[in-house]
């Protein structure tokens, strides 16, 4: 029985974000916590080397995505969404299975291979978004893309919670650090089967266009070549870089500052996900009705930089849960208004090109902080990557406040 493609696509997005969420509670324990029973390095290994290796392992996925996602998008235009989506999901399933195997046999190279494979085939999200655009009428596009945000939220709430729960042997005796990844692999495999059997091709305008294998790098050069959008792109890059520092290393910070285990890290990130959804439901639209995007960004970027710093000052774990709603509010407002401002600044016929450029900027911005943060944590302290998140967000606010000038419609040269 065929189902409406939107619901299959939304399930795909939930699976994709759920897998990312599962990593949050587990990964810091594998390479960043010598006191964890899941620690994969020898007891005589330098703790700092684990931090650096942790950073490289986190960076592998977005670095591979930087090159592969534009290629998968082109393949979906050329051969259709269905085969590319199925291939991406199969790669995701195999990647999680290899990651679980790497934990079981204590093979760090296999963990890197697994994350690289998932990154190379990780075009699920971009192809899913294109599929929704294929089947959505213009007047329903905002509503259906809002469902994407809701699917993101579900994945980011359930993922960390499941990651902490399924890795806890006190819940079920045979649970371990590998269990969440076996579970994610099975879900992705089921989703692959669902796409193959129940998903109708949505791309009715398949075009045999030339392939550009280095589209990601070309997109970065293109961003610099559009003068009217440089400030927005630079702000987006810095914001995502700051968020990359935070999301990559906050679990490590929680372990060493407050002695959090997998379950407590999972509960914290699940709470952040709940706050993010509540922001989307109750705050974003109300603020958008009263203020323009530039007005919102001038206080939300400064707000998120300040709240990131506030995490460092928290005297007890309870304060983290108090700060999280404020952090999620400023973060959600910044994301929504940067996307809205970029969309309003270009003509409708080039929205696709601008979306591709933005995706490449985000992938590169997500790849750099783990590489840098591992060295920061190893040579200074585990708090330093969180401080770097705050400072990078502050620079994003400075750049936008000082350099941004409104444009009616950007001239694409």
Which residue stretches match the model-derived regions?
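C-terminal ends and interior cores of transmembrane alpha-helices
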Residues: 90-105, 302-315
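C-terminal membrane-cytosol helix-exit motif in multi-pass small-molecule transporters
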Residues: 186-205, 396-404
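Helix-to-loop junctions at the C-terminal end of transmembrane segments
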Residues: 67-80, 279-293, 377
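Juxtamembrane intracellular "pre-TM" segments in multi-pass secondary transporters
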Residues: 200-234
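Cytoplasmic helix-loop-helix junction between adjacent transmembrane helices
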Residues: 112-152
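C-terminal transmembrane helical hairpin of 12-TM major facilitator-type secondary transporters
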Residues: 294-338
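Short amphipathic helix-loop junctions that connect adjacent transmembrane helices
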Residues: 26-51, 248-264
